[in-house]
């Protein structure tokens, strides 16, 4: 089972004016609120008993060794070795039909150390973190084979796609414990470009 706590930070700038003074910073601290983020899951079979995958998401307290403040939590049992778990939020107030450059940071917590071995892959290095943006609502839909798939190009497993890029994994430095540790994953040096919706 792969579990993580996540904190998301976004840096947004117009591609036609990339000076720091023209940029907009959107920052979300989940200690006081979930800020309207919605969780979802994809890349698993549509079966009669969804509890088989033990899909869970919530806004809850972090482990005590991380201070106990609230955070977004998501987990699932990866029977398919391909389970995709995500948080999404609609951003408004951007210029409509405009190409923008995003640099996204995600702060998360993981208890899985580097170098561990698990069934279907390492619980740290083989759990990939991605970030992206699209001008429509991301959601999982059932394909003709009866599997939940995303309505965007996120890539598969360790590869990014047209709408999402890989920013790291959930492996923490090996400290000899199962305690959660804070990790920072970001797109610095690899900005992501997307065109905003007609409504901005």
Say what each PLM segment does.
Residues 21-52:
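Extracellular carbohydrate-recognition regions
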Residues 79-95, 187-189:
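Short beta-strands within extracellular/lumenal beta-sheet-rich domains
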Residues 194-200:
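Noncatalytic modules at the cell exterior or secretory-pathway interfaces
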Residues 119-141:
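Short edge-strand/loop segments of extracellular domains
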Residues 140-194:
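Exoplasmic/lumenal beta-rich domain surfaces
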Residues 99-113:
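A short beta-strand element within beta-rich, extracytoplasmic domains
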């Amino acid at each position: 089972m792969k579990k993580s706590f996540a904190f998301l930070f976004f840096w947004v700038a117009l591609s036609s004016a990339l000076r720091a003074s023209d940029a907009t910073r959107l920052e979300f601290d989940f200690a006081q609120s979930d800020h309207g983020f919605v969780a979802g899951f994809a890349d698993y079979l549509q079966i009669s008993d969804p509890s088989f995958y033990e899909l869970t998401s919530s806004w809850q307290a972090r482990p005590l060794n991380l201070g106990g403040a609230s955070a977004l939590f998501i987990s699932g049992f990866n029977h398919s070795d391909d389970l995709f778990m995500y948080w999404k939020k609609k951003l408004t107030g951007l210029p409509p039909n405009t190409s923008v450059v995003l640099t996204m940071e995600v702060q998360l917590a993981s208890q899985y150390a580097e170098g561990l071995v698990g069934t279907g892959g390492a619980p740290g290095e083989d759990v990939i973190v991605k970030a992206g943006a699209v001008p429509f609502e991301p959601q999982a839909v059932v394909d003709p084979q009866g599997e939940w798939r995303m309505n965007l190009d996120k890539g598969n497993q360790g590869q990014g796609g047209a709408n999402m890029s890989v920013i790291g994994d959930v492996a923490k430095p090996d400290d000899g414990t199962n305690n959660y540790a804070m990790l920072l994953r970001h797109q610095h040096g690899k900005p992501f470009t997307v065109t905003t919706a007609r409504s901005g």
